[in-house]
Amino acid sequence: MKIMVINGPNLNLLGIREKEIYGAKDFNQVIDYIKEEGKELGLEINCFQSNIEGEIINFIHNAYFKKYDGIIINPGAYTHYSIAIYDALKGVEIPTVEVHLSNIHKREEFRHKSVTAPACIGQISGFGEYGYIMAMNALKKHIKSK
């Protein structure tokens, strides 16, 4: 089972940016953790990160053309306003889980709304990097049940 993990803007700054919110692990440590846990679950995990909306959309399109079974996406700030990412997710019809390291509902009001989540089968928020593992388990179960 192939899963694409897409991380959006500023996630490459993990371990540098607002450690009290996002944790002390750097981006590469989080990616290594995701890949290790994915392997234990029998998943093929490929991770991508971009600060550019169009590149994120290209990753989503590539997931379709390369026949990925699922997508895990942390759109970063694009969560709150990217209709283009929403449209890309809806367009490829690949089961997707949206993940956020912090609880977006406990933060600034402008972070409470996700325009991308309605294109997903679910959203996981507030569990740090473990949210990605929760998403892998949820996707695996969802895909197997089809």
From Swiss-Prot:
Q: Where is the active site?
A: Y22 (proton acceptor), H100 (proton donor)
Q: State which residue ranges cross the membrane.
A: none
Lineage top rank: taxon: Bacteria
Pathway assigned to this chain's UniProt record: Metabolic intermediate biosynthesis; chorismate biosynthesis; chorismate from D-erythrose 4-phosphate and phosphoenolpyruvate: step 3/7
- Name the Enzyme Commission number(s) assigned to this protein: 4.2.1.10
Signal peptide coordinates: none
Q: Please cite one Gene Ontology biological process associated with this protein.
A: aromatic amino acid family biosynthetic process
Residues noted as binding substrate in the record, renumbered to the chain: N74, H80, D87, L101, S102, R111
Which GO molecular function annotation, any one, does this entry have? 3-dehydroquinate dehydratase activity
- What subunit structure does UniProt give? Homododecamer.
Checking PANTHER family in the record gives:
CATABOLIC 3-DEHYDROQUINASE
This chain belongs to the protein called 3-dehydroquinate dehydratase
The gene name on file is aroQ
